[in-house]
């Protein structure tokens, strides 16, 4: 009888033993400093509640609700929608449904002239030639469809004065609106239904939709989504785990890596939200920094929303999280310094020793195991 053990069998045996070894020496971290700072933020901002979620590739490390918030609390996530929408665009690129370099006119021929030359990556990185237009009423008109809104943009919304396609970074919402309609036409599916079928359902997500401000089919791609804490966390886990979650591969690692490519590098900054400080770094629907251009976290991506909702992924540390509040306009003058402090406190606690998971994910976490 051959007593040799194959490498795959040895790995499987080790995978069974490792959780028990960790559980014997580790316990859940309390993240007290981060929680205290968050609680102070809620008091200072006069907010009724909030929530914190922190995890890594293998499971959840911390989940806590404050005040009136609980597991069923759903809030508008404002610009947190950009990363949520960007994940669907990346999936369609991965599947070959969207060519990331193709001009928009190849799918939406109503876009002509220079604005017909922008591509979907430019649309989702604020480098398309549109921008400084987050408050355009067309994006939030619930009486029309996404198709009608984008036809109006093609007809009657020129590029922002003085802008060129690919010539500057200018934060806004119109270009992502166009990208959402491009996705509908290329895939043959309604935006919201497609997202829910191909990302939401496989991940067990039930609360994410684009109805944050009332029933509509004019989905505000860049700012109209809503979510509870756990569902946003499920999507962040997919990203931190290189496109695999809930025992499903939904994105390739190479496609997820696009999130950390700085599309704004070398471009003049024509407009940016309040509180954003140089250097401005932006990927696909997400900022590339640790809040305020903190270069200690060059592989940190986030999509902070105007109401304070903060989904984030730290690819360098293999962590993800969601800080959940629902404030009013201007709240981020208070959330940004608080979130900086919370991230530092979380990193410090994790660096101090092993933190056990409060919930394990049923996954295999070994690079390239799928190629064996």
Question: Over which residues does each language-model region extend?
Answer:
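Catalytic-site signature segments of enzymes, centered on catalytic residues
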Residues: 65, 74, 134-233
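Active-site SXXK
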Residues: 38-39, 52, 58, 75-101, ...
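Active-site-proximal loop and beta-strand segments within enzyme catalytic domains
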Residues: 45-48, 69-172, 189
């Amino acid at each position: 009888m051959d007593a040799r053990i194959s490498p795959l069998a040895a790995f499987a045996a080790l995978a069974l033993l490792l959780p028990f070894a960790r559980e014997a020496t580790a316990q859940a971290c309390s993240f007290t400093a981060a929680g205290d700072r968050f609680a102070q933020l809620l008091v200072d901002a006069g907010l009724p509640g909030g929530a914190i979620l922190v995890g890594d590739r293998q499971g959840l490390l911390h989940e806590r609700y404050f005040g009136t918030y609980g597991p069923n609390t759903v809030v508008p996530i404002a610009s947190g929608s950009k990363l949520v929408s960007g994940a669907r665009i990346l999936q369609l690129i991965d599947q070959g449904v969207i060519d990331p370099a193709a001009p928009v006119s190849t799918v939406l021929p109503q876009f002509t002239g220079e604005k017909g030359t922008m591509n979907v990556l430019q649309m989702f990185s604020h480098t398309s030639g549109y921008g400084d237009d987050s408050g355009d009423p067309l994006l939030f008109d619930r009486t029309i469809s996404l198709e009608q809104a984008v036809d109006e943009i093609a007809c009657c919304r020129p590029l922002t004065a003085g802008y060129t396609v690919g010539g500057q970074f200018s934060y806004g919402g119109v270009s992502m609106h166009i990208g959402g309609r491009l996705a509908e036409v290329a895939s043959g599916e309604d935006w919201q239904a497609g997202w829910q079928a191909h990302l939401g359902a496989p991940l067990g997500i039930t609360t994410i939709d684009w109805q944050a401000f009332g029933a509509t089919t004019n989905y505000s791609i860049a700012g109209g989504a809503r979510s509870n804490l756990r569902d946003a966390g499920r999507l962040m886990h997919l990203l931190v785990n290189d496109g695999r979650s809930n025992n499903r591969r939904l994105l390739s690692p190479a496609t997820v890596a696009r999130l950390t490519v700085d599309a704004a590098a070398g471009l003049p900054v024509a407009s940016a939200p309040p509180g954003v400080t140089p250097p401005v770094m932006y990927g696909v629907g997400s900022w590339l920094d640790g809040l305020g251009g903190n270069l200690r976290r060059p592989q940190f991506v986030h999509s902070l929303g105007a109401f304070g909702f903060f989904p984030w992924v730290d690819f360098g540390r293999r962590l993800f999280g969601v800080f959940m509040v629902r404030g009013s306009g201007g709240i981020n003058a208070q959330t940004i310094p608080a979130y900086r402090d919370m991230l530092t406190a979380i990193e410090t606690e994790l660096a101090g020793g092993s933190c056990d998971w409060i919930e394990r994910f049923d996954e295999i976490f070994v690079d390239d195991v799928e190629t064996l």
